[in-house]
């Protein structure tokens, strides 16, 4: 069986400069981050003694584009890294195996490049827009771009500039640990003796995207009130650090009266299962995603991870966390009682069985979707599959990027 390697490509409008990237997702391992490595091909007669410059940039949009009036901007663009790609400033640069293969295949006009994310740079996050909002979405987005000019300060012309969006993501640690998060609360009532105790325990601390969360609920009713119903939620908590804004959204929920009412002196132990999925929140404004909802492989935004010894308060960009929330309805006069149990929602780490299964499913979908798509072709000599860099759609492929 021959294993092909997919390579993404994108050219300038005039077709004179072409980007080649071996991947679109780059992983933050907390102690280091994958470098952005690729190859750029430029026609030498087009340069005419000019140079090709590259940039790694991030755009942090924290307000709606339509609200930008009187010169007020609700976005920041930062150039994280820049370099002169052609001619190379470091001819002894160590190339990755993918770069070596591409340079060998594409010839003398191919030039490798490498950019690095700075420490503590935020992960890619997109906040889902409202249906009638056609502006740029809120969130953190990374772009790799190249342009032709005499110097880095030259005005960038669209016809000779190529840019493509990449993602910076985080993976779960290889070991998910043995800790079982739990919470215990109790509630008393005015003019009534006794309390209702609620204990919630999760079966693990780290869940992968698409996995069931199992919450075991134990209710002990030592009061004179009755529990009428139980509500379960998975809550996504979002913090936009630039404007110090925080909000929460339910990404999965259920309500049940099974085992209810829980009368005075009675107990109940029951396990509830919920699956938080981006596909079930297509029309929910403000839901945080790790890409755009129209992408075929989009997930809910992963929990923000920080290095050991630091807390999420030190993180920048958009900070994401999750919790399971259980609410008990204690009647009209008794009100509600609730508790939250935090957990982490992450991508499975490379090398794990879950990651291999996920990659296999994505590969099957990709082969099926792109089998007859123009711009997707294979070079049998080096087992390289070239694909025009474009957004992958859920139901079709739009190659007009």
Swiss-Prot record:
Keywords, alphabetical: Phosphoprotein, Sensory transduction, Vision
SUPFAM superfamilies found in the cross-reference section: E set domains
Family annotation (InterPro entries): Arrestin (IPR000698), Arrestin-like_C (IPR014752), Arrestin-like_N (IPR011021), Arrestin_C-like (IPR011022), Arrestin_CS (IPR017864), Arrestin_N (IPR014753), Ig_E-set (IPR014756)
GO biological process terms on file: G protein-coupled receptor internalization; signal transduction; visual perception
Xref: SMART domains: Arrestin_C
Annotated PROSITE patterns: ARRESTINS (PS00295)
Position of the signal peptide: none
Gene Ontology molecular functions: G protein-coupled receptor binding
Tissue: Inner and outer segments, and the inner plexiform regions of the retina.
Top-rank taxon, per record: Eukaryota
Gene Ontology CC terms, in alphabetical order: cytoplasm
Protein function: Undergoes light-induced phosphorylation, probably plays an important role in the photoreceptor transduction.
Family: Belongs to the arrestin family.
Protein name: Phosrestin-1
Name of the encoding gene: Arr2
